[in-house]
Amino acid sequence: MQHEDKTPEQQENKTPETELQQENAPATPQEAGAAGSIDDRIAELEAKLAEQQAAVLYAKAEGENIRRRAAEDIEKARKFALEKFSSELLAVKDSLDAALNVGSATLESYRDGVELTAKQLTAVFEKFSIVEINPVGEKFDPNKHQAIGTVESEAESNTVVNVLQKGYTLNDRVLRPALVMVAK
């Protein structure tokens, strides 16, 4: 076993850290340049990663904002869906109130007032695509009619001969079927 004679100063300089540094130190200037470019590349990729993470967070926040605004718009649409229809009906209500407040009216003037009010209401219905179902003479259609009974009639079998209560559709969707009597 050989014994190396080193001064205590030389032994102090040789620590595990300095040994690691010497082992990891680039042997050539090319390796030193490559290590620097790797560090630059890592820094560049970390910057891109941070940028992409920020973009993802922004997109998530934007998506949440869109969902929130859509929910608010839907709630407003529900809340005020009948606003225009209701305001149109106010004129009909005003006409009925005016008729009731007339002191000395004849039966004929009441009838005229009711007819005008019915015309107002029909105009409101037309404006909002509410269509009357009055199927006298038509073939019975269970999608639009509700048969209350059958009667003997000269009309063709399964034909509506009498309407007890008119039905209505809204944009071709049945609000209420017509109550009808059908020929046997």
From Swiss-Prot:
GO cellular component: cytosol
Location of the region described as Disordered in the Swiss-Prot/TrEMBL record: 1-39
Record's subunit section: Homodimer.
Amino acid composition bias (Basic and acidic residues), ranges on this chain: 1-17
Biased composition (Polar residues): 18-27
PROSITE patterns reported for this sequence: GRPE
Gene Ontology BP terms: protein folding
Protein name as it appears in the record: Protein GrpE
Reported function: Participates actively in the response to hyperosmotic and heat shock by preventing the aggregation of stress-denatured proteins, in association with DnaK and GrpE. It is the nucleotide exchange factor for DnaK and may function as a thermosensor. Unfolded proteins bind initially to DnaJ; upon interaction with the DnaJ-bound protein, DnaK hydrolyzes its bound ATP, resulting in the formation of a stable complex. GrpE releases ADP from DnaK; ATP binding to DnaK triggers the release of the substrate protein, thus completing the reaction cycle.
Lineage start: Bacteria, Pseudomonadati, Pseudomonadota, Betaproteobacteria, Nitrosomonadales
This protein's encoding gene: grpE
UniProt keywords, alphabetically: Chaperone, Cytoplasm, Stress response
InterPro entries documented for this protein: GrpE (IPR000740), GrpE_coiled_coil (IPR013805), GrpE_head (IPR009012)
Compartmental location: Cytoplasm
Molecular function via GO: adenyl-nucleotide exchange factor activity; protein homodimerization activity; protein-folding chaperone binding; unfolded protein binding
Family: Belongs to the GrpE family.
One Pfam family linked to the record: GrpE
The organism's place on the tree of life at top rank: Bacteria
Alphabetical list of SUPFAM superfamilies matching this protein: Coiled-coil domain of nucleotide exchange factor GrpE, Head domain of nucleotide exchange factor GrpE
PANTHER family: GRPE PROTEIN (PTHR21237), GRPE PROTEIN HOMOLOG, MITOCHONDRIAL (PTHR21237:SF23)
Cytoplasm in keyword set: yes
